Amino acid sequence: MSWIERILNKSNITQTRKASIPEGVWTKCDSCGQVLYRAELERNLEVCPKCDHHMRMSARARLHMLLDAGSEVELGSELEPKDILKFRDSKKYKDRISAAQKDTGEKDALVAMKGTLQGMPIVAASFEFAFMGGSMASVVGARFVRAVEQALEDNCPLVCFSSSGGARMQEALMSLMQMAKTSAALAKMQERGLPYISVLTDPTMGGVSASLAMLGDINIAEPKALIGFAGPRVIEQTVREKLPPGFQRSEFLIEKGAIDMIVRRPVMRQTLASILSKLTHQPQPSVVESKADTVAQPENQADV
């Protein structure tokens, strides 16, 4: 028997169980590295309260943030992707679809809904970047066109939140065709004189930026969002030159006149309501309690 065992009475020694912390309770800001409480970050609309970095947000969370509670009606939810080409790279396309559906709970990379924004009828769509990089494929194009058709039927504006890496390579020409398909649908909105507001979030690239994302009557971007066709790393390798600081970011684009506004996420809903009321010649909506009223303000920053 060791000396410590002789000193301590075994009957008085109690076993302690190591407390375990469930996964997903904490997360880290991609920009400042600050450790953040997950529930608090969700209440803050995925905006870091320390540095104001706008993290990626799910499609449904964006639409619920925008539309009045209880007014949301989903459009095109019955549409599902199909592996028409039997495509396979390092993995079968159908397996990639199944994995993405399991991870996100979505059938494809775009969610569309109709509802009201402070009482104004609107149709809204949002890309789900977690679903295969928000890539545009047949179902994405079909749902977007369904959203346009609903806006035409209801004679109301359309708002789209873009967050995509571009066209989905696994559907080849079928995905590239969606660029023309969505652009043609938006031309009908223009003919009817109905507003289309495009909100560009991080990242908006490739075929999406070359079609529906940049065709808004007003193009709004979130702060520091990456927006372009090819990525900066690809461009640098092609031209063999160093790109200027902030190239393809929202602040760079607005300086060059490529976009119209940069709006922080906490004030996005009220800003869209104000713009749409002017474009549709409706009374200016009163400032009501917003879904973002509890959003923390970053240090030394004001709303844009």
UniProtKB/Swiss-Prot annotation:
Main EC class the enzyme belongs to: transferase
UniProt keyword Transmembrane present: no
Ranges for domain CoA carboxyltransferase N-terminal: 25-294
Assigned keywords, A-Z: ATP-binding, Cytoplasm, Fatty acid biosynthesis, Fatty acid metabolism, Lipid biosynthesis, Lipid metabolism, Metal-binding, Nucleotide-binding, Transferase, Zinc, Zinc-finger
Intracellular or extracellular location(s): Cytoplasm
Chain's role: Component of the acetyl coenzyme A carboxylase (ACC) complex. Biotin carboxylase (BC) catalyzes the carboxylation of biotin on its carrier protein (BCCP) and then the CO(2) group is transferred by the transcarboxylase to acetyl-CoA to form malonyl-CoA.
Protein's UniProt name: Acetyl-coenzyme A carboxylase carboxyl transferase subunit beta
Organism: Yersinia pestis
